[in-house]
Amino acid sequence: MGPKKSDKKGGKAKAKGGADGEVLGEDPLQFLQNYTRFSKLIGVAPNPKVVAQLQSDENQPLTQASTWYTFTIVVDDEHGPLGPGGTRALTTAIMGTGQDMRGGPYRLMKSLRLWRARCGDEGARSIAEVLRLGGAEVQLEYIELFDDNIGPTGALALGQALSIGCNKSLLSLKLDYNPSLGSEGTASLCRGLRTNSSLKQLHLPYCDLGADAGPALGEMLSFTKLQLAVLNLQGNRLEAEGMKALSPGLARNRSLVYLSLADNGVGSGDADVAALEDFRDAMMSCSTLTHVDLLYNRIGERGARVLLPALAPENKSQIKHFLVDATLPTPLFEALHRRDTGGGGKKGKKKGGGKGKKKKK
């Protein structure tokens, strides 16, 4: 089922029976009323952080709707996890579809950020419903679900909501620190995203992706409709096998600008060197790719030498930003490592450089 079409004609929809200038779906206090009512109806306590944001003076309705005004909900675990039920209450209020709700969908909602909210698969499915059915009425552009216990079922729902013919508004999807996602969840997500032509950023750091996630990621990258510019896979375990499987899709891709495979267990053995050869060729074939991060992969001298042609001036390398592990011998490190500093030159190795501590945002 595709997204609902807006009933707007040349402007904002007016509330039925309302005063002149009243705009349907742009009153945060009405949104708050819908949220608290539905929360009580399903037996969950309204989240104090959500309530505070909707009551803030900065978010009160204007006399006339402003086209630049947008709204972001940010929820963490300060008052306890939001949970699946709390997430359902929030998304139902966003859509304005719950029992006795007024005002319609909350049109100003553009960003949703849930940190350690433990929304789980059920919560992810309710967010997917907003993406799938919101259409022109709820145009979410940015979703950030950090450490929310999302697994394959939730990933499948998000992928389906973002497949061709469904959502066209979402630009960034961040699912960092969801280890229950794994390779299975990544494959489910990629099946939907491979036909998406609007998403620009996908972040899956520390989601326990294994080597078997490589084929799904590579297949997604190979689809011509895909317009993804940023793919962040830091902190997983793709290793040599996953890198090798991803490379053919990368070679055919014509949209990716930034790719992070930092801290993915790529080493210096024979299989690793062979995978790095394929990855090098893919980098040279992907004409849009300018930023690559391979930090914290101990590729060794053999692996480093394999990558050199991808950055050689005589090969007309387009790579502006290339990060490699600081444990490499200094000459090789300096031949490979480069940072895009907005016009500045290459920077040398820092003393004592090594793997940094993983931090949750």
Regions found by a protein language model. Give the residues of each.
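Leucine-rich tandem repeat or coiled-coil scaffolds
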Residues: 1-361
